[in-house]
Amino acid sequence: MFQGELRIDSQVPRGKGLKSSSAVGGAVLRAVASALRQSRSPEELARLAADVAQEIGLSATGAYDDCLAALRGGLVLTDNSKRTVLRSPPFTPGLGVVLWVPSKTHVPSVSFRERFQAEAGAGRAAVESARAGHWAEAMTLNTELVERIMGYDYRALRSELMAHGAAMCGVSGMGPALAALASEEHVDGVASRLPADRGEIRRIELRLRDGGSTENE
């Protein structure tokens, strides 16, 4: 029987909508596969991580999209119920990410899940925009849905970020973190509009992995 000790050291804060559970789940399985000298693709590891997350009740869908994006990087649109990739186009280099991570924490609740299920139609509109390649529109539609259900009020802040150079911006996961993508010359301007007194501001540089996906610097 395989035995070992696992130590997790992550820079991704919990309860902020930054997909810490999916990132950790995929990383753990990749570490175990490596220790057992087994070669597994990101898709295989993501499917297994999603199955486990769904089985133990960590995620209603398994969050296959989050698991795969954390393992592989890049733009990923998936069918979580079928554990398949719908679209994964090349990522355009030259964009930076600015994260605003509020001090408050998201606490999962069954009531939120039920409210998202009731708003499935609005969610499908965001998916169709993404399938058509309209990523900014999809991000906005998804953000408006999450804000409505979770009670966030970021509309004015999002407008401010877009006015100062953000190519797109929106809530990460179920929040409360907010993410904005901007060209390198606009990253500082976007970051300057975020309320530093109410949360942490992080600038994340993206670089291409082999195959055109992205990885945090």
Which functions belong to the PLM regions below?
Residues 18-42, 71-73:
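DPxDG-like acidic metal-binding loop motif
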Residues 70-71, 100-103, 172-173:
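Short beta-strand segments
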Residues 10-19, 54-61:
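A short glycine/serine-rich beta->alpha loop
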Residues 43-88, 158:
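Alpha/beta catalytic cores of group-transfer enzymes, especially the acyltransferase/condensing modules
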Residues 2-5, 32-49, 189-194:
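Phosphate-handling active-site elements
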Residues 1-16, 34, 192-193, 205-217:
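ATP-binding N-lobe of GHMP and related small-molecule kinases
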Residues 91-153:
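Acyltransferase
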Residues 132-217:
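Glycine-rich, charge-dense phosphate/pyrophosphate-binding loop(s)
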